[in-house]
Regions:
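Substrate-binding pocket helix/loop in short-chain dehydrogenase/reductase
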Residues: 90-91, 98-103, 208
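Conserved NAD(P)H cofactor-binding loop of Rossmann-fold oxidoreductase domains
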Residues: 83-87
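Conserved glycine-rich cofactor-binding loop
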Residues: 9, 16-18
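Active-site helix of classical SDR
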Residues: 114, 151, 159
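Residue(s) in the substrate-gating loop at a strand-loop-helix junction
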Residues: 134
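Active-site loop-to-helix junction immediately N-terminal to the catalytic Tyr of the SDR YXXXK motif
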Residues: 94, 141-149, 161, 189
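Alpha-helical segment proximal to the catalytic Tyr-Lys
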Residues: 119, 164-165
Length: 222
């Protein structure tokens, strides 16, 4: 590692598994002071051994909780928004509750964290905000991902909007649109869909693999 994040403070959501977990460890390995959060703090039990400085329970659906933790930890240089929820369904099978939950976790949570941490970045005259979107978004349509794709498209939109508003004040805002990543979340969704569709877990996993241009699932470390 190069130590390129030495002296930087990074705040991450959904650091208990998958991309968030791998990124927390990667940031720490590069020298950052990492503040990792997750709805389930027990999933972050191994992070401090990997150099992560702080771990906190956080429900990103709560504005009060986000604001309180932001005030507690103080200004950061890097905000990594990774919390997400994958709903499976079409417009005809997606309830209002499914739609609202998808947008609350996938898009509005980023609105909350950016609003909480951006003032500190502006005071310093620099900062980096990284939002995890998805290939299932404005990038491309994926069958059976109606609410998920729409909410992740919103992530692309809010990323561009914040970038346009604050680039001249030293704030960089980017989104990453991964393909399907091997993770505990994917394992759980594969088992759920196998049961619903009357297929094996292996058949469902192959459906995910077949959609990937490189012919395999990605890894969180990648």
């Amino acid at each position: 590692m190069t130590g390129r994040l030495t002296g930087k403070r990074a705040f991450l959501t959904a650091a208990g598994a998958g991309i968030g977990h791998a990124t927390a460890l990667a940031f720490a390995a590069e020298g950052a002071y990492v503040i990792a959060t997750d709805l389930k703090p027990e999933l972050m039990a191994d992070l401090k051994a990997g150099g992560v400085a702080e771990v906190h329970a956080l429900d990103v659906r709560s504005t009060a909780a986000v604001d309180a933790l932001a005030a507690q930890v103080g200004p950061v240089d890097i905000l990594f928004n990774c919390a997400g929820f994958v709903h499976h369904g079409t417009v005809l099978t997606t309830s209002d509750e499914d739609w609202d939950l998808s947008f609350d976790i996938n898009a509005k949570a980023m609105h909350r964290t950016i609003r909480a941490f951006l003032p500190g970045m502006l005071a310093k005259g620099e900062g980096s905000i990284i939002n995890i979107s998805s290939g299932a978004s404005s990038v491309r349509g994926i069958p059976n991902r109606y609410a998920y794709g729409a909410s992740k498209a919103a992530v692309v939109g809010l990323t561009k909007a914040v970038a346009a508003d604050y680039i001249r004040q030293g704030i960089r805002v980017n989104s990453i649109a991964p393909g399907t990543i091997q993770s505990p979340s994917l394992d759980g969704r594969s088992a759920e869909q196998a049961e619903k569709q009357g297929k094996t877990v292996e058949e469902i996993r192959q459906q995910f693999i077949d959609r990937q241009p490189m012919g395999r699932l990605g890894t969180a470390e990648e």
